Each structure stands twice: as C-alpha cells, then as structure tokens.
C-alpha cells in the first residue's frame, strides 16, 4: 500500500516552457596568447521583458552546473540637495563659510550686517 507522504502532488512549473531558452557555451579569445576562454552571450528583447533593461546591474550567483542572474533594483536617485552639498564640499573653505552664512540668513538664524 502506498504511504500518504509518497503520493506525488500535481504542481505548476515555476517557468513556463515558452520562457525556456537554450544556448551553447562558446568561447572568447584572450590577447596576447589568444587562449580560448568559455563565454556565454545573452541578447534579445526578452531580456528587457524579463527586467534586464540596458544598464541594469545584475547579481550573478555561480554554483556547480548552475548560474543564476538576478536584476538588481535601480539605486535611489540622489536628491538635488545632496548633489548641491557634494558641490559645496569641493569649494574652498572661504566659499563654504559663505554658503553656511547664506543658509543661516535664509533659515532666519542670522541677520545681514
């Protein structure tokens, strides 16, 4: 008699067969000795549809017989204020003091002499 824990449960595949891709590992030539190194090239509109638009940072995990590519979320854009602060940091000490005084005047903490 079959044990209840050994009965296969029906399940849906995580990846539909229409989304499967097959490719062959090719090679790239390395200068100066022109030795062949393994290379995998991925290209196609399906990459963008899968979340891998041009410029996307990709995390690569490598295991025996398995490579997992994960698209990283875009970094939060730096605020305009932080960009300005970075520019002020590059100024001379005298100009930095002028900026601080200006901020003080705008904030109402100081009065113009």
Curated annotation (Swiss-Prot):
Its main location: cytoplasm. Residues 29-74 form the SpoVT-AbrB domain. GO terms for molecular function: DNA binding; RNA binding; RNA endonuclease activity. HAMAP family: Endoribonucl_SymE. Involved in the degradation and recycling of damaged RNA. It is itself a target for degradation by the ATP-dependent protease Lon. Belongs to the SymE family. This is Endoribonuclease SymE. It comes from Escherichia coli (strain 55989 / EAEC). The lineage of its organism: Bacteria, Pseudomonadati, Pseudomonadota, Gammaproteobacteria, Enterobacterales.
């Amino acid at each position: 008699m079959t044990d209840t824990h050994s009965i296969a449960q029906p399940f849906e595949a995580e990846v539909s067969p229409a989304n499967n891709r097959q490719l062959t590992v090719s090679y790239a030539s390395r200068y100066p000795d022109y030795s062949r190194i393994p290379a995998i090239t991925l290209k196609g509109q399906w990459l963008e549809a899968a979340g891998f638009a041009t410029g996307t940072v990709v995390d690569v995990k490598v295991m025996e017989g398995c490579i997992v590519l994960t698209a990283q979320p875009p970094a939060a854009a730096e605020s305009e204020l932080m960009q300005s602060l970075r520019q002020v940091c590059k100024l001379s000490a005298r100009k930095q003091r002028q900026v601080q005084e200006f901020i003080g005047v705008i904030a109402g903490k100081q009065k113009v002499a």
